[in-house]
Amino acid sequence: FLSLIPKIAGGIASLVKNL
């Protein structure tokens, strides 16, 4: 589960960066 956190956080960061 802990390994998914950076992946999700990275995905959110990418979405915010694209906005």
UniProtKB/Swiss-Prot annotation:
Places the protein is found: Secreted
The organism's place on the tree of life at top rank: Eukaryota
Major location (coarse): secreted
GO cellular component: extracellular region
Tissue and organ distribution: Expressed by the skin glands.
Keywords, comma-separated and alphabetical: Amidation, Amphibian defense peptide, Antibiotic, Antimicrobial, Cytolysis, Fungicide, Hemolysis, Immunity, Innate immunity, Secreted
Positions carrying Leucine amide: L19
GO biological process: defense response to bacterium; defense response to fungus; innate immune response; killing of cells of another organism
Function: Antimicrobial peptide with activity against Gram-negative bacterium E.coli ATCC 25922 (MIC=25 uM), Gram-positive bacterium S.epidermidis ATCC 12228 (MIC=6.25 uM) and against fungus C.albicans ATCC 24433 (MIC=50 uM). Has an anti-inflammatory effect, since it inhibits the production of the pro-inflammatory cytokine TNF-alpha. Has an activity of stimulation of insulin release, which may protect the species from being eaten by predators by causing fatal hypoglycemia. Is cytotoxic to cancer line cells. Shows moderate hemolysis on mouse erythrocytes (LC(50)=28 uM).
Family membership: Belongs to the frog skin active peptide (FSAP) family. Phylloseptin subfamily.
Protein name stated in the entry: Phylloseptin-1.1TR
Natural source organism: Phyllomedusa trinitatis (Trinidad leaf frog)
